[in-house]
């Protein structure tokens, strides 16, 4: 696989992370520091690279088992997180339990949900006998960069438009989950 193909693959895999990071940036409002941008982008990048490695090591032998339910895992996680964001958007701003993109548990859930495709890609890369280190590191770095941009962009956009961005973000997460489910059920 040529490096340009690896780069395009990494960009494609990072699109769900971009959507999630834009939402996270919008929800952060005045708490969008460089450290918080790095935290969100790092978690999303590490999960993308890590799931690629896990998929690669699982290889062809387990592909049929993983493909049977990976879309349900992603859908369920994104439905839950999106639903929580929508529910939280109806509450008062001061209430505890508001969707927090900096919460480690939330970040891990988002990391898993947005990197399920990377697991399948890792399996495919094992079949192709592609060099794992190049693939996984490129996927992780590209996802980090795109996610960092997404958090920053989402934060700037969110400050300019006074909308219920957590409501919109929740709908986006549910939309991503639904897209993953439909693609796997009807188009794979």
Swiss-Prot record:
Transmembrane segments: 2-22, 40-60, 66-86, 107-127, 133-153, 167-187
Keyword Cell membrane: yes
Major site of localization recorded for this protein: membrane
InterPro entries attached to this UniProt entry: Mntp/YtaF, Put_MntP
Coiled coil: none
Cell compartment(s), UniProt: Cell inner membrane
One MF term in the entry's GO annotations: manganese ion transmembrane transporter activity
Pfam families recorded: Mntp
Membrane-topology descriptor: Multi-pass membrane protein
GO cellular component: plasma membrane
UniProt keyword terms in alphabetical order: Cell inner membrane, Cell membrane, Ion transport, Manganese, Membrane, Transmembrane, Transmembrane helix, Transport
Family: Belongs to the MntP (TC 9.B.29) family.
Stated role: Probably functions as a manganese efflux pump.
Family matches, as HAMAP family: MntP_pump
This protein's name: Putative manganese efflux pump MntP
Organism: Parabacteroides distasonis (strain ATCC 8503 / DSM 20701 / CIP 104284 / JCM 5825 / NCTC 11152)
Record lineage: Bacteria, Pseudomonadati, Bacteroidota, Bacteroidia, Bacteroidales
